[in-house]
From Swiss-Prot:
Domain notes: The Q motif is unique to and characteristic of the DEAD box family of RNA helicases and controls ATP binding and hydrolysis.
Domain Helicase ATP-binding, chain residue ranges per copy: 128-312
Binding site for ATP: A141, F142, T143, G144, S145, G146, K147, T148
Disulfide bonds: none
Pfam family, one: DEAD
E.C. no: 3.6.4.13
Protein name (record): Putative DEAD-box ATP-dependent RNA helicase 43
Zn finger limits (CCHC-type): 499-516
Gene3D superfamilies cross-referenced by the UniProt entry: P-loop containing nucleotide triphosphate hydrolases
Source species: Arabidopsis thaliana
Domain Helicase C-terminal: 323-483
Length: 542
C-alpha cells in the first residue's frame, strides 16, 4: 500500500489542550504557576545535549545613521514618550522616525509608498531598529498596529543579503521562518512577503523564493518549492512539524524565527509543536515574539527561548486599542438577532460580526441575506476554499458584512473596518481584545459594539469592566453595578505592580478565580479519567 506523504494527522484543539494540562492533575503537589515554568528551555535537542547556552545576541551588518547614533538617552526617551512606546532590556537600539534612515533598498521604500505607508507606526519606530540590529524581541502591540512589517522587512533584507553573498542551492533554506496560529493569518503574511519580494525583482534584485506551508493544501506542491531552495517560509505549526518530521526540509540555515500571535499559539495548544520545531535548529537564531496580550505563561515561554530580549510595548499588554470606541449593550438572548439590524445602521460598511459558535454564524448569515444585507460567513466547519472565497469577497468590498467565529480574529488584516459587533461576549478577555482589534487601525477611529446578558459569567464581565476602565471608555450601568474581589484589593495590586490574573492576563480577577485555568484543569481531569477507565468502562462511549 502506497504511503501518502501529504497526510497530516489532525489533533483537535481540545485534545492538544488536554495533553498540555494533564500534568496539572498528575502532579498535585505542585503550585499552579510551577506548572507553567517546569518545561525545558526552548532549545534544540543538540544544543541541550551539548550544554550550549547562548548569552549574546547575533551581530548584523546594520547600523543606524550617525545622527541617530549620536542621540542622547534623553532624546531617545522623549521620542518614545511622544510615540507612547515603552521599552525594556539592555543596550536598546534607538528609535527611528522614518523608513529612509532604516536603510531599506529603494524598491522596498517605493512599495511602502505605493501601499500608502508614508511614516512608521509606533511599533515600527522602535521595533524595526531592534530587529535590524539582530536583537531578540518581544513585541506587544494591539492588532492593526503594523507589527507585520516589523518582521517581514528585516527577514527580506536578511534573505537578500544571504542570496547575494552565497545563492541558495536546491534543497537549501529557509533563511527566515514565520509561525502563525491560523491558515488565514499565514496566508495574509505570505501575501505581504510576496508583494515586497516582487518589488525587488522588478528592480533587478535576485529572486527570493517564499513558501506558504499550511494544512489544507497538497503537501507535494509545497515540497516542490522546498526542492528548488527556499528563502522564507510562512507556516502553521502542524504542517511545519510534519514536513520537518519527514525530513523534507531543514532549518540548518535558518537565522530568523518569528512567532506571530504567540498568545494564540499557546492558547490553541501548539506549544509542544513549537518545541518540536526548535529541535531542528542547529545553531543560534534571532527570535521574535509578537503578541497582543502578555500573560505570565507567555512571559515564561518567551524567557526560555530568547537571548537578552528587548521588549517593545506600544500599549499595555491586555489593554484594548485606544482608537476603538467600545460600546457595551445589554440585550436579551432572544432579541439579539433582531437588534443586530439596528446596530448595523451605526456605521457604513464594512462590518465584522463575531459569534462564539458555528450555528449562530450560519443563522445570522441566513437572516441577513433574507433582509437583503450583502453578507458572507466563515467558521471552522467550512472548507478552506469557501473560507478563502468569502474573505476575498469581503476584502474586495463586494460584500458589506462578514459573520465569523474567532477563526477570523487571529490577526487577519481587513482594512478600513468601520464597526465590529460581538454578537456574543467571548469567554476570555484576550479574545475580546483580538476581536475589537479588527477596527480602529492605523490611527483611524472605529466602533466595537458588544452584546451582553445574563448568559455571561460575572468574572468575564468584571474583566470587561476593568478593561473598559483602563481604556477610558464609558462603563454601562449593568457593569458599573458589578463589584468583585478585585475592587477590594486594587490598592494592594497597584502597590505591588501586579494587575489582574497572573495566568491569563484578565484584569477583573486573580488566578484563584481564573475561569480559563479552571477550564483547562477540568479538561485535564476529564481526559485523565477517560484514559484510566477507557471506552469500555463505566459511562463507556455510546
Amino acid at each position: 500500500m502506497e504511503v501518502d506523504d501529504g497526510y497530516v494527522e489532525y489533533v483537535p484543539v481540545e485534545e492538544r489542550l488536554a495533553q498540555m494540562k494533564r500534568k496539572v492533575v498528575e502532579e498535585p503537589g505542585k503550585g499552579m504557576m510551577e506548572h507553567l515554568s517546569d518545561k525545558k528551555k526552548l532549545m534544540s535537542v543538540g544544543e541541550l545535549a551539548r550544554g550550549i547556552t547562548y548569552t549574546e545576541p547575533l551581530s548584523t551588518w546594520w547600523k543606524p545613521p550617525l545622527h541617530v547614533r549620536k542621540m542622547s538617552t534623553k532624546q531617545m526617551d522623549l521620542i518614545r514618550k511622544q510615540w507612547h512606546i515603552t521599552v525594556n532590556g539592555e543596550d536598546i537600539p534607538p528609535p527611528i522616525k522614518n523608513f529612509m534612515d532604516m536603510k531599506f533598498p529603494s524598491p522596498l521604500l517605493r512599495m511602502l509608498k505605493d501601499k500608502g505607508i508614508m511614516h512608521p507606526t509606533p511599533i515600527q519606530v522602535q521595533g524595526l531598529p531592534v530587529v535590524l540590529s539582530g536583537r531578540d524581541m518581544i513585541g506587544i502591540a494591539f492588532t492593526g498596529s503594523g507589527k507585520t512589517l516589523v518582521f517581514v522587512l528585516p527577514m527580506i533584507i536578511l534573505a537578500l543579503q544571504e542570496e547575494i553573498m552565497m545563492p541558495i542551492a536546491a534543497g537549501e533554506g529557509p533563511i527566515a521562518l514565520v509561525i502563525c496560529p491560523s491558515r488565514e493569518l499565514a496566508k495574509q503574511t505570505y501575501d505581504v512577503v510576496e508583494q515586497f519580494v516582487a518589488s525587488l525583482v522588478e528592480d533587478g534584485y535576485p529572486r527570493l523564493r517564499s513558501l506558504l506551508c499550511i494544512g489544507g493544501v497538497d503537501m507535494r506542491s509545497q515540497l516542490d518549492v522546498v526542492k528548488k531552495g527556499v528563502h522564507i517560509v510562512v507556516a502553521t505549526p502542524g504542517r511545519l512539524k510534519d514536513i520537518l518530521a519527514k525530513k523534507k526540509m531543514s532549518l540548518d540555515a535558518c537565522r530568523l524565527l518569528t512567532l506571530d500571535e504567540a498568545d494564540r499559539l499557546v492558547d490553541l495548544g501548539f506549544e509542544d509543536d513549537i518545541r518540536h520545531v526548535f529541535d531542528h535548529f542547529k545553531s543560534q537564531r534571532q527570535t521574535l515574539l509578537f503578541s497582543a496580550t502578555m500573560p505570565a505563561k507567555i512571559q515564561i515561554f518567551a524567557t526560555s527561548a530568547l537571548v537578552k530580549p528587548v521588549t517593545v510595548n506600544v500599549g499595555r499588554a491586555g489593554a484594548a486599542n485606544l482608537d476603538v470606541i467600545q460600546e457595551v449593550e445589554y440585550v436579551k438572548q432572544e432579541a439579539k438577532i433582531v437588534y443586530l439590524l439596528e446596530c448595523l445602521q451605526k456605521t457604513t460598511p464594512p462590518v465584522l460580526i463575531f459569534c462564539e459558535n458555528k450555528a449562530d454564524v450560519d443563522d445570522i448569515h441566513e437572516y441577513l441575506l433574507l433582509k437583503g444585507v450583502e453578507a458572507v460567513a466563515i467558521h471552522g466547519g467550512k472548507d478552506q476554499e469557501d473560507r478563502d472565497y468569502a474573505i476575498s469577497l469581503f476584502k474586495a468590498g463586494k460584500k458589506d458584512v462578514l459573520v465569523a467565529t474567532d477563526v477570523a480574529s487571529k490577526g487577519l488584516d481587513f482594512p478600513d473596518i468601520q464597526h465590529v459587533i460581538n454578537y456574543d461576549m467571548p469567554g476570555e478577555i484576550e479574545n475580546y481584545v483580538h476581536r475589537i482589534g479588527r477596527t480602529g487601525r492605523c490611527g483611524k477611529t472605529g466602533i466595537a459594539t458588544t452584546f451582553i446578558n445574563k448568559n455571561q459569567s460575572e468574572i468575564t464581565l468584571l474583566d470587561l469592566k476593568h478593561l473598559l476602565q483602563e481604556a477610558k471608555q464609558r462603563i454601562p450601568p449593568v457593569l458599573a453595578e458589578l463589584n468583585g474581589p478585585m475592587e477590594e484589593t486594587e490598592t494592594i495590586a497597584n502597590a505591588s505592580g501586579v494587575k489582574g490574573c497572573a495566568y491569563c492576563g484578565g484584569l477583573g480577577h486573580r488566578i484563584l478565580q481564573c475561569p480559563k485555568f479552571e477550564h483547562q484543569k477540568s479538561v485535564a481531569i476529564s481526559s485523565s479519567r477517560k484514559d484510566h477507565f477507557g471506552s469500555d468502562g463505566y459511562r463507556g462511549e455510546v
